[in-house]
Amino acid sequence: MSSSYYVTPSQQRTLRACMVCSLVQLHSKFMRDGCPNCDNVLGLRGNNDAIQECTSQVFEGLITLRDPSTSWVARWQRLEGYVAGTYAVKVTGSLPDDVITNLEDSGVRYIPYVYLPGSCVSGDTDRLVGGMAVRWRRRPEVLELSSEVEVQFAWI
């Protein structure tokens, strides 16, 4: 295929998702071009260490957006304003504290998705996950994490 976005089956192991915007690309494409949505803050282009810290091989679901400005799926996933491409529905991983600080210093409003059993805050949504009632915290105002909490990141 002639598209630069085509990924052969043998290359699928090297797919990674940006932990800030959820864009999915090959490791080599992150290395060559960086992340088109947030490279100005993350500096992934040509930086293998940053790619390892700020992208993840653990993600679920794929969404391909041709025109994020008019797509209801882009609005639903909060991907409006991003470039056309393939995005993960859920990215699992944890950004280093210094990267989160850099995002905040750059004026990027970074809020991770967090699944927490038990207590809930205003605006939470009940979900049934694996037969267990879980609160889905979409927009936490104050986020306190412990080592027991699994965090899935998304840009809001």
UniProtKB/Swiss-Prot annotation:
- Zinc finger regions, C4-type: 18-38
Gene Ontology CC entries for this record: chromosome, centromeric region; DSIF complex
Q: What is this protein called?
A: Transcription elongation factor spt4
Query: What one GO molecular function would you report for this record?
Result: zinc ion binding
Whether ATP-binding counts among this entry's keywords is no
Show the Gene3D superfamilies listed in the entry. 3.30.40.210
- Per its UniProt record, what Pfam families does this chain match? Spt4 (PF06093)
Keyword Transmembrane among record annotations: no
**Which key words tag this protein in UniProt?**
Centromere, Chromosome, Metal-binding, mRNA processing, Nucleus, Transcription, Zinc, Zinc-finger
Location(s), subcellular: Nucleus; Chromosome, Centromere
Q: Name one GO biological process term.
A: transcription elongation-coupled chromatin remodeling
Description of how the protein assembles with itself and partners: Component of the spt4-spt5 complex. Interacts with RNA polymerase II.
Q: Which domain of life is it from?
A: Eukaryota
Q: Which family does it belong to?
A: Belongs to the SPT4 family.
Instruction: Give the primary localization class.
Output: nucleus
User: Which InterPro entries does the UniProt entry name for this protein?
Assistant: RPABC4/Spt4, Spt4, Spt4/RpoE2_Znf, Spt4_sf
Function, in words: The spt4-spt5 complex mediates both activation and inhibition of transcription elongation, and plays a role in pre-mRNA processing. This complex seems to be important for the stability of the RNA polymerase II elongation machinery on the chromatin template but not for the inherent ability of this machinery to translocate down the gene.
